[in-house]
């Protein structure tokens, strides 16, 4: 299992555009073989800062998403229009996954 953590701070004037793109991409990511889930939360201590946490079966699934056309085009738009004041992406393999039975 692979977790992708996308921390970001959208430009306040372009935040609506980011969320429009994210809504469209949600429909696309759900079609990717190996996609498990995605959650997005806003920071309590830093309003306007968000974390998107996606879960994947394996790295091959993450790569399929990274190469998906709509996703690539959205990334290009985000870079060219400077939708984000700041962002960081972390990709991690899950060593353990457990909870109550």
Task: Describe the predicted segments one by one.
Residues 1-50, 57-67, 77, 82-101:
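Short S/T/G/P-rich N-terminal loop/turn motif that feeds into the first structured element of a domain
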Residues 74:
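Conserved short loop/helix modules at catalytic or binding sites
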